[in-house]
Amino acid sequence: MTLLFDDFKSIVLNKTPLLDVRAPVEFKKGAFLNAVNLPIMNDEERHKIGICYKNEGNAKAVELGHSMVSGDIKEERIKAWIAFMDANPNALLYCFRGGQRSKISQEWLHVRGKEILRLKGGYKAFRTYLINKLSESTQHFKPIILGGRTGSGKTIVLEKMKNSIDLEGLANHRGSSFGSKLNAQPMQIDFENNLAYELIQKIEDGFKTLVFEDEGKHIGNAFMPENLISTAINAPLIILETQIDKRVEITLNEYVVQAQEAYLEAGFDFVLEEWSQSIQNAMKRIVRRLGNEKYTKVTAIFESALDEQKKSGSYDGYKEWAKFLLEEYYDPMYDYQIQKRSHMVAFRGDAQEVQNYIERLSDI
């Protein structure tokens, strides 16, 4: 069959659903946006067939594969593919290199009267396309960097701007010591793939200027591409200035209220216990930088707030905890870092002033 597809750009722009027939272990190492893993072989089957291929050659490996994936097992997998195709009529199929696994899957579906295009070159070719686009993307836009103290509401401002890219959202991390979320961060490969998707879409939309939050070389476990780091070094830095009371409110909402809701939605039986343990673990990680005396104090404030919530259901006690962390931990680090880059600051203002300035700078 020659039902091949290699218009990778259209996959990105249309956010095309993808049927990934690689083994689960391959999928976990890296996949694409809108891809669903419905493997033709599970990990154990793939391992055994790989050994056979190495020792006895391709023909024997294919023969073994057909014998292992047959009968009810084969039927269940084909049914899963058909169900996915029925729900996503424009779906595309891929394996690692666009070879035997996706071709055989395509043939099995053809026998059932279902036609699906497979990616030419498979995962490897599409991944190469995305990495190349990621590498050359900085040639097509000018960056603007949005900075500001922790809790100033930078993400809120970014969400209002069509030409922004939420790096913390892509990394599933808030970018601070307390920034980890309940769901695990994506693999580095997935982070890069998703970032490439975003950049391709924004550039295609005609944006010549893109706004990013001020980040370091990594966001949690996700490392920033070198070309973005080097481009951001000379970009204008816009500082969002927010009063401390508002910062406390934003921090309380993100790190306490929303975080606890996430634990509740995830089905944890002991929400406060699980959430508070994660906060206490995070505080232990900063004890060296914070100092023993301040660590003891902030821990006591947190435990008092936790007791108050258990008794009354109120979040108010956490305001003192958030304010202490902002002023005693985050702000000194911010002041030190921003002092070294003060010459890059192009503008300072509140949320509306910053948004207006960036829009003028972006010519939106």
UniProtKB/Swiss-Prot annotation:
Catalyses which reaction(s): 5-methylaminomethyl-2-thiouridine(34) in tRNA + selenophosphate + (2E)-geranyl diphosphate + H2O + H(+) = 5-methylaminomethyl-2-selenouridine(34) in tRNA + (2E)-thiogeraniol + phosphate + diphosphate; 5-methylaminomethyl-2-thiouridine(34) in tRNA + (2E)-geranyl diphosphate = 5-methylaminomethyl-S-(2E)-geranyl-thiouridine(34) in tRNA + diphosphate; 5-methylaminomethyl-S-(2E)-geranyl-thiouridine(34) in tRNA + selenophosphate + H(+) = 5-methylaminomethyl-2-(Se-phospho)selenouridine(34) in tRNA + (2E)-thiogeraniol; 5-methylaminomethyl-2-(Se-phospho)selenouridine(34) in tRNA + H2O = 5-methylaminomethyl-2-selenouridine(34) in tRNA + phosphate
Gene Ontology biological process: tRNA wobble uridine modification
PROSITE patterns, sorted: RHODANESE_3
Pfam families assigned: Rhodanese (PF00581)
Keywords recorded for this protein, A-Z: Selenium, Transferase
Top EC class of this enzyme: transferase
InterPro entries: Rhodanese-like_dom, Rhodanese-like_dom_sf, SelU
Domain of life: Bacteria
UniProt-recorded Gene Ontology molecular function terms: tRNA 2-selenouridine synthase activity
Catalytic residue list: 95 (s-selanylcysteine intermediate)
Entry keyword annotation includes Transferase: yes
Enzyme Commission code(s) on record: 2.9.1.3
Sequence ranges assigned to domain Rhodanese in this UniProt record: 12-135
Gene3D superfamilies per UniProt: Rhodanese-like domain
Function: Involved in the post-transcriptional modification of the uridine at the wobble position (U34) of tRNA(Lys), tRNA(Glu) and tRNA(Gln). Catalyzes the conversion of 2-thiouridine (S2U-RNA) to 2-selenouridine (Se2U-RNA). Acts in a two-step process involving geranylation of 2-thiouridine (S2U) to S-geranyl-2-thiouridine (geS2U) and subsequent selenation of the latter derivative to 2-selenouridine (Se2U) in the tRNA chain.
Family of this protein: Belongs to the SelU family.
Listed HAMAP family: tRNA_sel_U_synth
UniProt subunit comment: Monomer.
Record-given protein name: tRNA 2-selenouridine synthase
Organism: Sulfurimonas denitrificans (strain ATCC 33889 / DSM 1251) (Thiomicrospira denitrificans (strain ATCC 33889 / DSM 1251))
